[in-house]
Amino acid sequence: MEFLVRTENLLPNDTPEELRDELRKGERERAMELREQGILKRLWRVPGRNATIGLYEADDPAALHDALVSLPMWKWMDVRVEALATHPQEKQQRLS
């Protein structure tokens, strides 16, 4: 299944810089692992916000949840997930 995942970083402004750097590093490393596992397909930044939009692929919502909670910044994220279904036009293009 494919999922569109919108995340916004809600890390408090008074978080020590050392902790911020550690979390960012861990987040990058974990994202690369998810890419290597074929779970994280694409990732975009949202201009003007501390937010991302990602295209994820997982067997089911529970597997996606497991991937998301493995992110070091999970507890400071506002996460919105939309399950995606293939549009009929996409199905037709694949057959052509």
Predicted regions and their residues:
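Conserved, structured core segments of small domains
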Residues: M1-S96
